[in-house]
């Protein structure tokens, strides 16, 4: 029993195990089938997605799509991180710049600035040619011969400086002679070579650290202190104040400013009354003279008012008794004023302000002290900064080696300026010299104001001698016999009171450079005298006589002695000037011009011109011009032009021309043009043309075109064409065309063509065509073509065509063209043209042109032209063109053409075309064609076409064609899914079934049979076991 139980237990265990295995197998197969369905569903989804995106049937693209998406996500993340890093980096300079800006502002606020300040700098260059200034331009009211020292002399003196240099000067006393020229005036100040890099320009070059001091003595005018009176400054009327100067003042070239004043004196003014003129601290009224005076205000030979300078540098005028007897007194006053070297120590912008009472004038000028003269390692500059005409003394300050270069065995000499009648006395008795050492070149003031307490006095360590009459010599005795820092030499000398000449000095620095070459550099100093003036007048006051004591008594009438010493001056000046001038010029010009002009001109001109011009021009012009011109011109032109032009032109031209032209041309052209054109053209043309052309063309064209064309053409054509063409073309075209065409064509054509073409085409076309064509055609064609074509085209065409064509054409053409063009054009043209043309032309053209043109043109032209032309043309053209064109054209053309053409062309074309075409065609065609064609074509075309065609065709055709076409049909089935299924799947938005399979019933049946078979086997084994028992 136990054994049986055990056996039953074993059998039952075994049966349960078999059932479990079968059930597990069924479940496993079911799960496996479910996974396979999911995988199939995913595969189908990926295939359709890939097909929708790339329109490709390549199975590899199915698996590549998800990888591409993952890669894009990764790239996007990387780009984001990179941009974040760049943003962080970019913020640091901004923060630094903000800090620097704040620091700069803080520094600027410490310097007081008044008025409008403009930062500008000029400088003379460090070359001998530039530093040698001629110091021309005469001062107004210059008195170079006056040497009076009387108390009434109001002349002020300013210094004039100029550098000189020479080489290989063996004799120390030998110097270069430079002729004296007139000193520069205020408005025409001398050397004007400019270089901001050599100028230490500051916004306000005013020394505010030291108290204001005057370099002149006020003792001479203290005795003229006014009598006690009242200040009537604010009672003056009709007050005018002006500052007259150029934008730049050169103090070391006798530069100064004019202070102009005008006013009316109240009738109540009496002797002793005063008024005050404020003078800015940046100016002084003495120049280099030690004693400052201001001019009296004169009324004829009478003094109206006397002026003195107070301790603040302002001017106080005191009225004389002239105002006691005059009414309506008016006065004007002009005073020269000079830049104060103590208060303006550096080159820079300075705002000047002066006034009478509440009426003031302000002006900002650039004070340019100019750079020292330099020749190789030698540098020097000097100035005469003080003249005492009472004591007959002067002071000269010289900067030796201000550049801080290394000068070996330096020697400084001072003499009278050659070829001048200088009044200086140079000897041991009349000349005292002090020498100061400067540790740092930046410690030197550009105005040559020197405070001796700030520098080391080394006078005792140098050797000062007077080797020749009117000459001193300073030898710098250093331990190594060379200097590397600047030195200041101050010369206090005397002038000869009996001399008729002016003060003129020359200072020369000698020394070796590191190559032991002996050179010299000189600097000349002179003075210029400037006068101030004051004038006024008035009307005599009425006098009330004494009344008689008794009635009837009559006072005797005095003789009339009315005296009016007032001075009125008026000047009328007329000038007639005739001038002849000849000019050869090379010009770089940048101009902005607006011009309205009406011009009648007859001109004959011969001109050779080389011109570089950048021009922006707005011009409205109406011009009638008869011009005969011979011109040889080489021109590089970048031109941006907006032009509105109305032109009526009648021209009759007979021209015989032989032309050989070599031209290099690169052209970038942007053109906007609106064009309406009515053209009637009769043309007889005999043309022989040999053309070699390489053309690469990128063309974007939007064209709306309506065309009515009646064409009768007789053409005989023999064409040998080798064509390589690379063309990228995107074209949107709306075309309405009515065409009647009759064509008789005899054509022999040998064509070898390699063509790569990418074309997208959408075309809408309505075409009515009646065509009678007789064509005999022999054609041998070898064609390799890769074509991708997208095209958008809307076309309505009615065509009646009669054509007889005889054509011989040999053409070699290489063309690269990028064209952007917007064209609106209105044109009426009647043209009769007979042209025989032979042309040889080599043309390279570089042109960058942006043109917006609105043009209305009426042109009647009769032209007879015989032309021989050979043309080799390499043309690179970038062109964008938007063209709206309405054209009515009646054309009758007889053309005999021999043409050899080799053409390389690459074409990418996008075209959408909807075409409605009604065509009646009767064609007789005999065609022999040998064609070898290799073509790779990717073409996407949306075409809506309505075509009504009546065609009668008799065709005899012999054709040998070898074709190698690699074209993948767009609708070929793949992976058991045909195009219709794909379309249905694409249009259906419902999700795929969970199983992803269509043989669901078959699978269930198979597994049911397997289960039944397992059950039979199980029951059979049980039965066998029972039988064994």
UniProtKB/Swiss-Prot annotation:
This is Clumping factor A. Residues 68-88, 106-132, 143-162, 566-602, 958-969 have a biased composition (Low complexity). Residues 996-1029 form a propeptide. Residues 40-542 are annotated as: Ligand binding A region. Residues 983-992 have a biased composition (Basic and acidic residues). One of its GO terms (biological process) is cell adhesion. A motif (YSIRK-G/S signaling motif) lies at residues 9-20. Residues 547-565, 603-957 have a biased composition (Acidic residues). It is found in: Secreted, Cell wall. Residues 1-39 form the signal peptide. GO terms for cellular component: extracellular region. Its main location: secreted. Belongs to the serine-aspartate repeat-containing protein (SDr) family.
């Amino acid at each position: 029993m136990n054994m049986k139980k055990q056996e039953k237990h074993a059998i039952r265990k075994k049966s349960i195990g078999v059932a479990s295995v079968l059930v597990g197998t069924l479940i496993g197969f079911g799960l496996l089938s479910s996974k396979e369905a999911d995988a199939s569903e995913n595969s189908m989804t990926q295939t359709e997605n890939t097909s929708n995106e790339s329109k490709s049937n390549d199975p590899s693209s199915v698996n590549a799509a998800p990888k591409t998406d993952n890669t894009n996500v990764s790239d996007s993340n990387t780009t984001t991180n990179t941009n974040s890093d760049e943003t962080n980096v970019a913020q640091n300079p901004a923060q630094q710049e903000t800090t620097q800006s704040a620091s700069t502002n803080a520094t600027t606020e410490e310097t007081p600035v008044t008025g409008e300040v403009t930062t500008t700098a000029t400088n003379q260059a460090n070359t001998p040619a530039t530093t040698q200034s001629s110091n021309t331009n005469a001062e107004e009211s210059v008195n170079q011969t006056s040497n009076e020292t009387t108390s009434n002399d109001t002349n002020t003196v300013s210094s004039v400086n100029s550098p000189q240099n020479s080489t290989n000067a063996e004799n120390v006393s030998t110097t270069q002679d430079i002729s004296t020229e007139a000193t520069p005036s205020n408005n025409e100040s001398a050397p004007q070579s400019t270089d901001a890099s050599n100028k230490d320009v500051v916004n306000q070059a005013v020394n505010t650290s030291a108290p204001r001091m005057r370099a002149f003595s006020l003792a001479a005018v203290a005795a003229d202190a006014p009598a006690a009176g009242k200040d009537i400054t604010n009672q003056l009327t009709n007050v005018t104040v002006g500052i007259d100067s150029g934008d730049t003042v050169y103090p070391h070239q006798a530069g100064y400013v004019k202070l102009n004043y005008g006013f009316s004196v109240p009738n109540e003014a009496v002797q002793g009354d005063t008024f005050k003129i404020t003078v800015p601290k940046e100016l002084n009224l003495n120049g280099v003279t030690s004693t400052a005076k201001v001019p009296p205000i004169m009324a004829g030979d009478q003094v109206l008012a006397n002026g003195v300078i107070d301790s603040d540098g302002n001017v106080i005028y005191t009225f004389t008794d002239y105002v006691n007897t005059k009414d309506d007194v008016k006065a004007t006053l002009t005073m020269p004023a000079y830049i104060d070297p103590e208060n303006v120590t550096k080159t820079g912008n300075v705002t000047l302000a002066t006034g009478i009472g509440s009426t003031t004038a302000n002006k900002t000028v650039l004070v340019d002290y100019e750079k020292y003269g330099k020749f190789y390692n030698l540098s020097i500059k000097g100035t005469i900064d003080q003249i005492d005409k009472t004591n007959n003394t002067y002071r000269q300050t010289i900067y030796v080696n201000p550049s801080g270069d290394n000068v070996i065995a330096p020697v400084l000499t001072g003499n009278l300026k050659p070829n001048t009648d200088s009044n200086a006395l140079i000897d041991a008795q009349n000349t005292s010299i002090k020498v100061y050492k400067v540790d740092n070149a930046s410690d030197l003031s550009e105005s040559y104001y020197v405070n001796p307490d700030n520098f080391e006095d080394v006078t005792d360590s140098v050797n000062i001698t007077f080797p020749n009459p009117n000459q001193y010599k300073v030898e710098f005795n250093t331990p190594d016999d060379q200097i590397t820092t600047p030195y200041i030499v101050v010369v206090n000398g005397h002038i000869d009171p009996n001399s008729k000449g002016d003060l003129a000095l020359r200072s020369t620095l000698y020394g070796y450079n590191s190559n032991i070459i002996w050179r010299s550099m000189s600097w000349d100093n002179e003075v210029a005298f400037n006068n101030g003036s004051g004038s006024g007048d008035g009307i005599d006051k009425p006098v009330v006589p004494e009344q008689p004591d008794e009635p009837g008594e009559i006072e005797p009438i005095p003789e009339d002695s009315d005296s009016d010493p007032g001075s009125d001056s008026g000047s009328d000046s007329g000038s007639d000037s005739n001038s002849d001038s000849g000019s050869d010029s090379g010009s770089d010009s940048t101009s902005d011009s607006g011009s309205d002009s009406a011009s009648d001109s007859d001109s004959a001109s011969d001109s050779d011109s080389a011109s570089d011009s950048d021009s922006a021009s707005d011009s409205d012009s109406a011009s009638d011009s008869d011009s005969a011109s011979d011109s040889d011109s080489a021109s590089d032109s970048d031109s941006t032009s907006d032009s509105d032009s109305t032109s009526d032109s009648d021209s009759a031209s007979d021209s015989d021309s032989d032309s050989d032209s070599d031209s290099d041309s690169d052209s970038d052209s942007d053109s906007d043009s609106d064009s309406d054109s009515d053209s009637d053209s009769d043309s007889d043309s005999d043309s022989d043309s040999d053309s070699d052309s390489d053309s690469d063309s990128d063309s974007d064209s939007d064209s709306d075109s309506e065309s009515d064309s009646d064409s009768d053409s007789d053409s005989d054509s023999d064409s040998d064409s080798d064509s390589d063409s690379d063309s990228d073309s995107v074209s949107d075209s709306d075309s309405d065309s009515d065409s009647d065409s009759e064509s008789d064509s005899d054509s022999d054509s040998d064509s070898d063509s390699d063509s790569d073409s990418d074309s997208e085409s959408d075309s809408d076309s309505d075409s009515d065509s009646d065509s009678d064509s007789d064509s005999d055609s022999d054609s041998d064609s070898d064609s390799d073509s890769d074509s991708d074509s997208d095209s958008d085209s809307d076309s309505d065409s009615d065509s009646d065509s009669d054509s007889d064509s005889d054509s011989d054409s040999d053409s070699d053409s290489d063309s690269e063209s990028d064209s952007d063009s917007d064209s609106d054009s209105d044109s009426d043209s009647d043209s009769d043209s007979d042209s025989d043309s032979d042309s040889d032309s080599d043309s390279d053209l570089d042109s960058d042109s942006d043109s917006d043109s609105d043009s209305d043109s009426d042109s009647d032209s009769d032209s007879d032209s015989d032309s021989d032309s050979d043309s080799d043309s390499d043309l690179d053209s970038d062109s964008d063109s938007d063209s709206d064109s309405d054209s009515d054209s009646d054309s009758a053309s007889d053309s005999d053409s021999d043409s050899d053409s080799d053409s390389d062309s690459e074409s990418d074309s996008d075209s959408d075309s909807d075409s409605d075409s009604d065509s009646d065609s009767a064609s007789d065609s005999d065609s022999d064609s040998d064609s070898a064609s290799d073509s790779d074509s990717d073409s996407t075309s949306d075409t809506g076409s309505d075509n009504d065609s009546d065609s009668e065709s008799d065709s005899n055709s012999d054709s040998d064609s070898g074709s190698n076409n690699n074209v993948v049909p767009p609708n070929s089935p793949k992976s058991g899914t045909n195009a219709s299924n794909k379309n249905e799947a694409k249009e259906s938005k419902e999700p795929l079934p969970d199983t992803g399979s269509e043989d669901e019933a078959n699978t269930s049946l198979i597994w049911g049979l397997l289960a039944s078979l397992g059950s039979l086997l199980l029951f059979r084994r049980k039965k066998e076991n029972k039988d064994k028992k």
